[in-house]
Amino acid sequence: MKFGKTFANHRIPEWSSQYVGYKSLKKMIKEITRLQEDIYRAHNKNSYDEGRPPTKMRDSSNSAQNYLDSPKIQKLLASFFFAVDRDIEKVDTFYNSQYAEYKKRFERLLSSNQFNEIKSTLVVDANKEDAVAQTLLTKDTREMNMLLKGTSQASRLSYHKDDLIEIQSILAELRKQFRNLKWYAELNKRAFGKILKKLDKKVGTNQQMSTMKTRILPLQFANDSLITKDLSLLKTIWEQVTFRINSYERVMRSTSPNANANDNTEFFKIICVFIEEDDSKGLIRELTNLYSELSLIPTRIMISVLNKAALSKSLACIDAILKVIPSLNDSEDINRRNFFHHHIIAIGKLIRKQEILSRKKKSQPSKYTNSEGEIVTDLRTLHTTLSAPAESDSITEEEKSSACTLSYILEELPIHLRPCLFQHDNYKRTPLHYSCQYGLSEVTKLIIKLMKEWNIWNEIPIDDVSAFGDAESLTPLHLCVLGAHPKTTEVLLQSLDPNVKLKSSSLLHLATEWNNYPLLHVLLSSKRFDINYQDNELHETPLYLACRLNFFEAAVCLLYNGADLEIREKLFGWTAIFVAAAEGFTDIVKLLIANNANFDIEDEGGWTPMEHAVLRGHLHIADMVQIRDELVTHPHSQLNSGSEEKEPLNEISAGELNERNENGNGGNKGSLGKLAGPIKSYGHRFLDNNESLILITLGSNDTRNKSPSISLSSEALAKVIGLETDCALSLVISCNDSIDKSSVILDLPLDDNVDAVDFKVPFKVDYSHTLYFDIVPTYGTRSLETHNRIDCQKNNNNYVMARGVSMLNKSYSSVGVNRSILNGSVTVPIIANHTLEILGTLKFEYIIITPFEHPQLPLERTETYWKSLVSTRVIGHRGLGKNNPNKSLQIGENTVESFIMAASLGASYVEFDVQLTKDNVPVVYHDFLVAETGVDIPMHELTLEQFLDLNNADKEHIQRGAGHSPHHVNGADTALQKYRGRSVDDSDVSTLRRAWDLHDNDPNGKSNNAHWSDNRMRLTKTFKKNNFKGNARGHSIASSFVTLKELFKKIPANVGFNIECKFPMLDEAEEEELGQIMMEMNHWVDTVLKVVFDNANGRDIIFSSFHPDICIMLSLKQPVIPILFLTEGGSEQMADLRASSLQNGIRFAKKWNLLGIVSAAAPILKAPRLVQVVKSNGLVCVTYGVDNNDPENASIQIEAGVDAVIVDSVLAIRRGLTKKNEK
């Protein structure tokens, strides 16, 4: 997940309209870069026919290629900065307004009489808690004894604890508000830094530093010093108040052993007893005794006693208090709240506490699936299931009885006290606001009923901010929706006149984000909202939002109430089916299709939902939204045609592939235009002989591992770091050996799928490098370039709050010379700087790429070689093709004979798999397990001698076998020897078949030799899975295993090699049960490279591998031989994120300067137009798989612009393509 998604998901819902328009600004940058690319292409056209290397992609670091003096680009830049200025103004205005409001509330608290009365009793130094505790306990005991004796000082103590509890509640709310505002400011500051950095990187400007310095950093929201200071003071007071409350409770328990230790509602037992027994006379008598006269009792005490009596449903006590209480308002109340405010808040907290205590975690069956586990898509069935209110919103007996008691109070209330029910507190909230906030539907119903009876209720929209808005512009209806209270929401809506129209259609978006069916259904059933309302920023409807967030319940409710499925959002012209298909939300896609969503449509870039799903690896979803339009499924490339060039449908920057395929100028459906050819350049920067590269991945590339990369305990942070817990934190990664003495800064919390961090270091044989992971305050210790490197000398102990350290040469246990473990995950503790307590953990993976030396390394390719790389060609898979269990003549896969025949039949390259034996010799073999041994043994556990001798075992058996005369065997061997000595054509097939027929067969047509071979392998994992083994005698024309060096000598020099480096990924090793110990990767790659460079002699060579780290090493160790990244493209489930989809494969290949990708044919066949996505990113596109054995499939791909197809049936595909070209 990149910052764009993190930004959207981390916003505070009620403030969603007040954030930076990040996506809109991002789209504007894409428009600028698209125009730059158009100008660049017009000046630099590729000339493939002349055999010259293709033109490089536009380099934004080259000012001459940015065309910033172009009037069109200057106009777009002016529009961009105008939009940035408007966003800066919006964010700054909102932040200042909210901060002023929260600051005013805090200052009001600190200046209140209640706070001043208890301030002198607070702990001065919270760090001396143990020393002060005894003093306070003694003082509390003395005060409590004075209370019990009826002394005059007891009157103050009687309400101290209530004041403390209220102050604690206010502090908690203020802390939440300040923290939300702080996060709001931090998120927007990051967004500005990110978008300006993206502008500089993509467009080639140099605006981030200057704009941040002059326009953003001087503003208050970009500097958190004031709010951090407020939070620090607030935290100090919070700790002292909490300590004081706990002290009172200890005194109560020590002074009155029979008192209820859990009673937090009264200080003195006797008053509580009178209220609980509803003894009004005793209550009045005790109060009179305490204060001499009723008129001397503070209003605050009277309100507190009335509140307790109401909570206890003590009607007699209520009557007695109402007769003597002078007012329901306490002029000295901190928040200017009256009895009704306090009482409704107390009811809400009491019911919420009961719900928490009674809530039990139960695993309930899914409401969305039937008995077979299939998703239900019928709206009526789903509506019946989902429309029942949640248990948390049901009306409890406590609420009913509380509402009855409140009703009784209101009936007995003198007329002159009625306005108290509608009085505003300091937050501009009435009791109705609080009843809605806590979801008290019965109380809300009662208040509205009385307002109507007393002619106070005005028939105006309940969501009208001017009439009902509080200090934060939240109305009672807003509070109901934000609290997800459907019952209370229904009460509010039913109280309105049918003709009254509501003003806040955006409430549907807020309700959608709760994914609460009953809440949404109540809103929509009222018919007062526009169900298709589009927000102002992105024009997203509630249905689109539900589908983007994968909120099934919300989507069902919206569809049931008639939401339009075909409304498009603003940025890319996507409907709901687009975002659901692109994100891979299977259930949502099924639901939309069942409700007739149109998926045979294109977005603004000309792409269909099917193509978006394929690109992101969701092939099962692509099947659901598959379209049959031949203009999409059989596009025609104009790559080498002489027709007029057309704009491509879409060009995607590799850096943006984690988002959407946003760019796009439209274009005609089915016409790919003149595809941008692969424009990769070689001779790229690689490691010098004295350099290594450390590549660090925070977390894991394994998508099965869901644990966070960094886990910090909030409790430990609060305890150890103290006042700084409310400051923004960053992670600084540094290496002691970094050549440029730099560090990398990442703001916390980390975005998902953070790009790998790298350090170039001096080469050390023992890998003795040390990594530091420091937790530091975000502000005051960094340069203006967010997420860029800073001088590691600044990262000193004055700023480091906590640190984790990893010594890389000690991070794993040694498993042998040139051996390593596959699961390279390291977890280090994060230790506090001063206390040395563990604050959390950090998990990462790393690889160290060491340099490779060879005399032939500076070798350069000719222009003819470039031409061969960009011309469509056929590559023989494992030579002539991989073997299959069909009863037909087959030459053994990965054999010399197979490679020679493939070349003679028209293959430009032959593809084969290379692995290393135990004694470090590269051999040609496909499977990780060598089944020919009769046991499941991996290749790296066999020596070369043992591996090659496996063929001799077969020959010896044949020579000893009964029924096989010497002339039979010798005849076959003679024919095979004749075949091996030269290239072959189709006429050799009959000779080979006759030689094969010399072997005796059993009645079933299977040779005795095959029985012997099968019997030996019958217990191996490979044979059990396939009941077959390639290049096995009896199944194919088997030949001897061969080393990589032998291939260079035996295969004609004009035949190119596509060398697949076969190194297992973690999930592959687990599936094949290979164990965790493998060849050390640098040693593996260096060994293969040495053989290749020793024997290349001008041969065309391409490396390829499914393992991303192997590709990285091959790219960084040498600049000569191009590398292709093999990917399933989503056709198979892969654990490594980089191999999980075509999109991630493109990003990976682009980042590490690879020649291109080799994708499984399935995704390309489903969406052939995606070939241009690959090629517009400067990459070669090659495909493989059994689908390529169909000439029609190969033809479709080649017409779409695929550079090469790897096939098993070389002759058939070549003939098919020839016939196609002739037509």
Curated annotation (Swiss-Prot):
Chain positions found as Phosphoserine: 653, 983
UniProt keyword Hydrolase, yes or no: yes
Domain SPX: 1-213
Alphabetized InterPro entries for the sequence: Ankyrin_rpt, Ankyrin_rpt-contain_sf, GDPD, GP_PDE_dom, PLC-like_Pdiesterase_TIM-brl, SPX_dom
Main localization, broad class: cytoplasm
Enzyme Commission numbers on file: 3.1.4.2
Region described as Disordered: 43-64
Pfam families per the UniProt record, alphabetical: Ank_2, C2_GDE1, GDPD, SPX
Cofactor (UniProt): a divalent metal cation
GO biological process, one term: glycerophospholipid catabolic process
One cellular-component annotation, GO: cytoplasm
Coiled-coil zones: none
Residues bound to a divalent metal cation: 911, 913, 926
Record's subcellular location: Cytoplasm
Enzyme kind, highest EC tier: hydrolase
Keyword RNA-binding listed: no
Bias type Basic and acidic residues, positions: 43-59
Knockout consequences: Affects the glycerophosphocholine metabolism but not the glycerophosphoinositol metabolism.
Function (record text): Glycerophosphocholine glycerophosphodiesterase responsible for the hydrolysis of intracellular glycerophosphocholine into glycerol-phosphate and choline. The choline is used for phosphatidyl-choline synthesis. Required for utilization of glycerophosphocholine as phosphate source. May also use glycerophosphoinositol as substrate in vivo.
Family annotation (PANTHER family): GLYCEROPHOSPHOCHOLINE PHOSPHODIESTERASE GPCPD1, GLYCEROPHOSPHORYL DIESTER PHOSPHODIESTERASE
Identification of the protein by name: Glycerophosphocholine phosphodiesterase GDE1
Organism expressing this protein natively: Saccharomyces cerevisiae (strain ATCC 204508 / S288c)
Gene name for this UniProt entry: GDE1
